[in-house]
């Protein structure tokens, strides 16, 4: 029999704590994040990360070990087909705990535990296309490394994107042209005769 954790247990008995953590883990994998008390979130974190590690392995034994805890077949399927492969290259730290304000009724400290989202392939492609096009994120962060290579490939594949970027730069007036226009406007106002 495993040694129970020291200190107060969630729910009172070890069996209730085990079921409580199983239900919290199921809800976490089903919804991607849940709001609960800080104590429950801290106890759930290693429990859920262990299940994600089993899902990364992906073999039959790992699936059976997860099925002991998570009784919902659709959640187990999601865990092994989507969540596990998403974190294949990540060595740990699959969840994040964000502290929230106290609960209204009893002022219990609340927290949100959620799965750390990695950028999907589609999101990565969109951000690289925006950097290559010169919009949104281009001013904040210039492409580096593999991103720069992908942006160059995108420019080579799509000459229209490069042409659009060149036209946009050509259409933008320079600071000197704007200053000259302003000076001409003020001179025109000064030379008008008063009636």
Curated annotation (Swiss-Prot):
Pfam name, any one: Ribosomal_L17
Gene3D superfamilies membership: Ribosomal protein L17
Disulfide bonds: none
Record-stated family: Belongs to the bacterial ribosomal protein bL17 family.
Entry keyword annotation includes Magnesium: no
Residues annotated as transmembrane: none
Name used for this protein in its record: Large ribosomal subunit protein bL17
Keyword Ribonucleoprotein part of the UniProt annotation: yes
Any GO BP: translation
Subunit structure: Part of the 50S ribosomal subunit. Contacts protein L32.
GO CC annotation, single: cytosolic large ribosomal subunit
NCBIfam families: L17
Annotated stretches, region: Disordered: 132-195
Compositional bias segments (type: Low complexity): 159-186
Keyword entries, A-Z: Ribonucleoprotein, Ribosomal protein
GO molecular function: structural constituent of ribosome
Alphabetized HAMAP family for the sequence: Ribosomal_bL17
